[in-house]
Amino acid sequence: MNFGLQNNIKMNTIIEEVKCPFYHVVGKEVEVFEQVYQNKLPILLKGPTGTGKSRFVEFMANKLGKKLITISCHEETSSTDLIGRFIIKGAETIWLDGPLTTAVKNGYILYLDEVAEARPDVIVAIHSLTDHRRELFIDKLGETYKAHDDFMLVASFNPGYQRGFKELKPSTRQRFVALSFN
């Protein structure tokens, strides 16, 4: 699905009804995820590359029967890429929702893979979605959207993965229920 992103933006955006992937449950991660989902909280998956974080999110989206939007974050991922932008269509300018706005409005699971790699404005954009407000403010429209009851924010990162790696601030991490993968 094209969210109106320019060709020079390297973003892997997928909206899908996930086919049931294989995932080997190793602890209470399924129960924790289900409780977090039921309580409308965000979850942060921490762990090194290859520990099954992305596979787990796909597995849980399938188990819950929810659509999943996956964003592979990188150093150029901006809040505009996630929220949306104005585009020219014919003789008019129209607003095109980004994947975050789409997930918030429609009750999808949004997975921000490697969120610490994204630009700082991404963290600012999701800030009010990670607390009791569960709201998305779109500055360019001057509008605030209350998250759909089924919306869930999932983020992952690899703490201490490599030298020079961007870390999430403690003030950001404390807004999420954390689940470690080893």
Task: Name every feature range the model reports, one short phrase each.
Residues 1-182:
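AAA+ P-loop NTPase catalytic core and its hallmark functional loops
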